Amino acid sequence: MQRPEAWPRPHPGEGASAAQAGGAAPPTRATEQREPSLYTIKAVFILDNDGRRLLAKYYDDTFPSVKEQMVFEKNVFNKTSRTESEIAFLGGMTIVYKSSIDIFLYVVGSSSENELMLMSVLACLFDSLSHILRKNVEKRWLLENMDGAFLVLDETVDGGVILESDPQQVIQKVNFRTDDSGLTEQSVAQVLQSAKEQIKWSLLK
């Protein structure tokens, strides 16, 4: 997926010379605040149907402590758990979410963030989780496959930057990392078994 690029900032003196030459004026402060940013995701978290955290990752210092994060999550849950909507606005942030059986999945961005972009990340996360959980997107299966859930999240968002919005690509990368890990563990097991065999034969001689 092609990442959005921020507008280039003019070097000192470039804006004045451009204005004198009849060119476009340098961006104003209001314009600069609307510049696209790679860092579009503030947080992703999953809560159970009582509002308790199951999984969470925050990508900036808006909520620097775990206590502040938990208060925010509780406020978000109270605002969204009894509504049919898929989007909410709270504390200057845009929140998109989806519920499944007994869990709620949330993606948080700034108030100026593109809602469709956030929704695409939410859909990617949900579809990828549905695949690794064999369509059982619920608390029990999530807790039993937490490593896979974190892999899905890491392949979708990294440091607040959207890496991927295609669930098929995410699943492929997660499977590759899982297979690679499995091969490594198998190789270690084979080395240990070979060492045991060598020790056994040396003792028999």
Swiss-Prot record:
Give UniProt keywords alphabetically: Cytoplasm, Cytoplasmic vesicle, ER-Golgi transport, Golgi apparatus, Membrane, Protein transport, Transport
Subcellular compartments: Cytoplasm, Cytosol; Endoplasmic reticulum-Golgi intermediate compartment membrane; Golgi apparatus membrane; Cytoplasmic vesicle, COPI-coated vesicle membrane
Q: How does it sit in the membrane?
A: Peripheral membrane protein
Cellular component terms per the entry's GO annotation: COPI vesicle coat; COPI-coated vesicle; cytosol; endoplasmic reticulum-Golgi intermediate compartment membrane; Golgi membrane
Q: Where is the composition biased (Low complexity)?
A: 13-30
Q: Which GO terms describe its biological process?
A: protein transport; retrograde vesicle-mediated transport, Golgi to endoplasmic reticulum
Q: Does the keyword Membrane apply?
A: yes
Give the start-end ranges of region Disordered. 1-33
Q: Which InterPro entries match?
A: AP_mu_sigma_su, Coatomer_zeta, Longin-like_dom_sf
Q: Compositional bias (Basic and acidic residues) at which positions?
A: 1-12
Provide the function of this protein.
Answer: The coatomer is a cytosolic protein complex that binds to dilysine motifs and reversibly associates with Golgi non-clathrin-coated vesicles, which further mediate biosynthetic protein transport from the ER, via the Golgi up to the trans Golgi network. Coatomer complex is required for budding from Golgi membranes, and is essential for the retrograde Golgi-to-ER transport of dilysine-tagged proteins. The zeta subunit may be involved in regulating the coat assembly and, hence, the rate of biosynthetic protein transport due to its association-dissociation properties with the coatomer complex.
Q: Which family does it belong to?
A: Belongs to the adaptor complexes small subunit family.
Spell out the protein name for this chain.
Answer: Coatomer subunit zeta-2
User: What is the organism of origin for this protein?
Assistant: Mus musculus (Mouse)
